[in-house]
Design a protein with these regions (language model features):
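N-terminal Rossmann-like or analogous alpha/beta NTP/dinucleotide-binding catalytic cores
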Residues: 14-59, 217
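Cys/His-rich short segments
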Residues: 57-112
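Structured secondary-structure scaffolds
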Residues: 35, 40-44, 48, 88-310, ...
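Single conserved hydrophobic/aromatic residue that forms the stacking wall/gate
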Residues: 1-20
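Short, glycine/charge-rich beta-strand/loop segments that flank catalytic centers
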Residues: 32-43, 61-74, 231
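Acidic, turn-prone loop/beta-hairpin segments
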Residues: 312-332
């Protein structure tokens, strides 16, 4: 059964309400809708944490790193840069500051060799091939233990054994794949039918979380990883990544209002090689629509309609549907 996100779960957040609106405009559907503030998610995260802690995969130590107050996020050294004497995040442009605090760590370094073995035994786990090579190179360069809790903020899921700490996003957000399946109720039909997931389709900028951290967490907890992670590219505007600061963001809703949803989908499927970055502009979109859809496809439709009018009087002939025909029609 397909069900849209319940309005009751969205009303508390304008951003979430916007998701519902865009989902309707983009003609998207889903089997379930989950937010990481739900009780079922907190239950899944807490259970996974308890397993990792019991297996001594997590320990308490000190964390130091770059933190952005506006982004509410920590950044590694390679994710920041200098701008006019100040440190900023490369991705958001927000200022960052150095902080030190007590933190729980996941023993990621311990899983370097097991992960490489897992990639070798499951060569299609990461796609496309270029992304797989990036991940393997990153893992081979050496993994450091990963900070998985914070004391600098109070919102979020508390560490079960230490309420002063909040479980950080690495472990929290990724677990939603399991919580949507009612984990830890692993004997239920929903979990058995859909886990391990056959594929995660994610942006290349969060590939490390899904192809390194996530399988490491799962392997450490004795849970099978997903069968495949596909890291798709970015939709670029003017050969550049879209950014508010650059003022080059193209809103898909505005494009759809002008050109239509199917025209936009056609352009993206035709012009963007799946897995690679793709470029979009109004000029390229208009050229594609006029050439392929208005001219080529339009001419085809006109010829077919004229043929049907001449030979069939534009009437669909009687047809006796077989059981297989009806089954296919019911499915779609």
């Amino acid at each position: 059964m397909i069900r849209r996100p319940p309005r009751s779960t969205l009303s508390s957040s304008s951003a979430a309400s916007d998701v519902y609106k865009r989902q309707s405009i983009l003609n998207l559907s889903n089997d379930d809708f989950i937010r990481t503030t739900e009780k079922r998610h907190a239950s899944a995260v807490t259970n996974l944490w308890n397993i990792l802690e019991k297996k001594e995969e997590i320990y308490l130590s000190k964390y130091s790193g770059w933190y952005s107050v506006s982004d509410e996020a920590f950044y590694n050294e390679d994710e920041i840069e200098d701008l006019e004497g100040k440190k900023i995040s490369k991705s958001s442009g927000s200022p960052v500051e150095w902080v030190e605090e007590e933190s729980y760590f996941f023993k990621l370094s311990k899983w370097q060799e097991p992960l490489l073995k897992f990639y070798s035994e499951n060569p299609k786990f990461i796609l496309p091939e270029s992304r797989k090579n990036e991940v393997i190179s990153f893992v081979k360069s050496g993994l450091k233990d990963l900070s998985v809790s914070r004391k600098s903020f109070s919102w979020g899921i508390k560490v079960p054994s230490n309420k002063d700490h909040v479980i950080y996003v690495w472990l929290d957000a990724l677990t939603n794949y399991l919580s949507a399946l009612n984990y830890p109720k692993e004997t239920e039909k929903l979990y058995k039918d859909f886990w391990p997931a056959n594929i995660h389709i994610i942006g290349k900028d969060i590939l490390r979380f899904h192809a390194v951290y996530w399988p490491a967490f799962l392997l450490a907890a004795g849970i099978k990883p997903p069968q495949r992670v596909y890291g798709h590219g970015w939709i670029l505007s003017g050969d550049e990544k879209m950014s508010k600061s650059k003022g080059n963001i193209l809103d898909p809703i505005e494009i759809i209002d002008i050109y239509g949803l199917d025209a936009l989908r056609y352009y993206l499927l035709k012009e963007v090689s799946f897995g690679n970055d793709g470029n979009i502009s109004k000029e390229k979109l208009e050229s594609c629509i006029n050439s392929d859809l208005a001219n080529n496809y339009g001419n085809l439709c006109q010829r077919v309609i004229l043929f049907c009018e001449k030979n069939l009087g534009l009437k669909v002939p009687e047809y006796n549907f077989t059981k297989e025909d009806l089954r296919i029609l019911n499915d779609f």
